[in-house]
């Protein structure tokens, strides 16, 4: 640990193997909270590298509980969190739209770290069981084409990181790693990050981890979602190549809304917002959801443009299919 910490503090990147070995030491309970915290802060101050992200992701992925699903072509739209926008649960709401549109959604998430309501919090408020065993989760996914995978339940190794992260109260490499370690192997991914400086790097990490197609997005003001206001930047992984792009709401046929109009609250309030969106109630919440679901359809390769993805998202919601997908999950991910 000392050598690795000194290396990072000197501004030098760890190799993938060095990070993998250090992560395994943490996972095996060999380091104290103070050592883990000092390491996370040092990495943040230096700036995380692709090799460090990949090494940590591979170690945590290997330690995760496997989900024995029969479905292929799985996708996730989990974000890094940590943007402190206090928005409603955008990616969680969009996941129902994506699943209703035919995308096999393995929604990976956690409780709130820096916001009022994480994806796990809002889904628990909707009656979703966070603690089903892996075999049952696989059955839910195979039947519904959507499942919520509670990170704390499926990543036993996280118990060594979570107390430290809560005490630090700042985004760390763990925020960046969380979306990379879905227990179900992913073919495609929409990943929101609050770090626009890491768009290209993260897309290349996803490439190294085997994603066939992926889109990494940062919204206006560093939101880890696409925003229907201001400028969005994204990196697209397509055909093995990473390209950088940007767009505004008007570029994809949408009107702008204000950040204040998409702020959420605690889990009960956010669960009502989610249901209202899936019921097609006109609002800034709905507009933000169709934008992010549209981006997800594009990331998945189901449509050939973001604008076409937005149109598909509106259609899925208007037909009631997204609300029905919520009801399906509520009926299956229980007990």
From Swiss-Prot:
Reactions listed under catalytic activity: N-(5-phospho-beta-D-ribosyl)anthranilate + diphosphate = 5-phospho-alpha-D-ribose 1-diphosphate + anthranilate
Any GO BP: L-tryptophan biosynthetic process
Names of required cofactors: Mg(2+)
Documented EC number(s): 2.4.2.18
Annotated binding of anthranilate 2, by residue: 165
GO cellular component: cytosol
Keyword ATP-binding: no
Pathway it works in: Amino-acid biosynthesis; L-tryptophan biosynthesis; L-tryptophan from chorismate: step 2/5
The protein's enzyme class: transferase
Binding site for 5-phospho-alpha-D-ribose 1-diphosphate: 79, 82-83, 87, 89-92, 107-115, 119
Binding site for Mg(2+) 1: 91, 225
Cysteine disulfide partners in this protein: none
Residues given in the record as anthranilate 1 binding sites: 79, 110
Cofactor note: Binds 2 magnesium ions per monomer.
Binding site for Mg(2+) 2: 224-225
Family statement: Belongs to the anthranilate phosphoribosyltransferase family.
Function, in words: Catalyzes the transfer of the phosphoribosyl group of 5-phosphorylribose-1-pyrophosphate (PRPP) to anthranilate to yield N-(5'-phosphoribosyl)-anthranilate (PRA).
NCBIfam families: trpD
Protein name per the record: Anthranilate phosphoribosyltransferase
Biological classification of the source: Bacteria, Bacillati, Bacillota, Bacilli, Lactobacillales
């Amino acid at each position: 640990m000392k050598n690795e910490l000194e290396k990072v503090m000197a501004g030098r990147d760890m190799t993938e193997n060095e990070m993998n070995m250090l992560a395994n030491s943490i996972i095996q309970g060999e380091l104290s909270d103070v050592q883990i915290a000092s390491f996370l802060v040092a990495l943040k101050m230096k700036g995380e590298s692709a090799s460090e992200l990949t090494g940590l992701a591979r170690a945590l992925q290997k330690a995760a509980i496997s989900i024995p699903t029969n479905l292929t072509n799985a996708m996730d739209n989990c974000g890094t969190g940590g943007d402190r926008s206090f928005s409603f649960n955008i990616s969680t709401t969009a996941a129902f739209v994506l699943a209703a549109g035919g995308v096999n959604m393995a929604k990976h998430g956690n409780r709130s770290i820096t916001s009022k309501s994480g994806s796990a919090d809002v889904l628990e408020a909707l009656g979703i069981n966070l603690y089903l065993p892996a075999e049952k989760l696989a059955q839910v996914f195979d039947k519904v084409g959507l499942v919520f995978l509670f990170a704390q339940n499926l990543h036993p190794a996280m118990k060594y990181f979570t107390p430290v992260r809560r005490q630090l109260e700042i985004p760390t490499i763990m925020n960046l790693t969380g979306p990379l370690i879905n227990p179900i192997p992913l073919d495609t991914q929409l990943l929101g990050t609050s770090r626009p400086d890491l768009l290209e790097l993260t897309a290349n990490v996803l490439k190294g981890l085997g994603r066939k197609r992926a889109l990494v997005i940062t919204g206006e003001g560093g939101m880890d979602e696409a925003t229907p206001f201001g400028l969005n930047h994204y990196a697209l992984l397509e055909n093995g190549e990473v390209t950088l792009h940007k767009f505004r709401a008007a570029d994809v046929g949408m009107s702008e809304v204000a950040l204040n109009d998409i702020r959420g609250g605690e889990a009960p309030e956010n669960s009502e917002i989610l249901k209202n969106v899936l019921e097609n109630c006109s609002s800034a919440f709905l507009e933000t959801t169709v934008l992010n679901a549209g981006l997800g359809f594009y990331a998945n390769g189901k449509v050939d443009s973001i604008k076409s993805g937005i149109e598909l998202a509106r259609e899925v919601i208007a037909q009631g299919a997204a609300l029905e997908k919520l009801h399906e999950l509520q009926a299956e991910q229980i007990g």
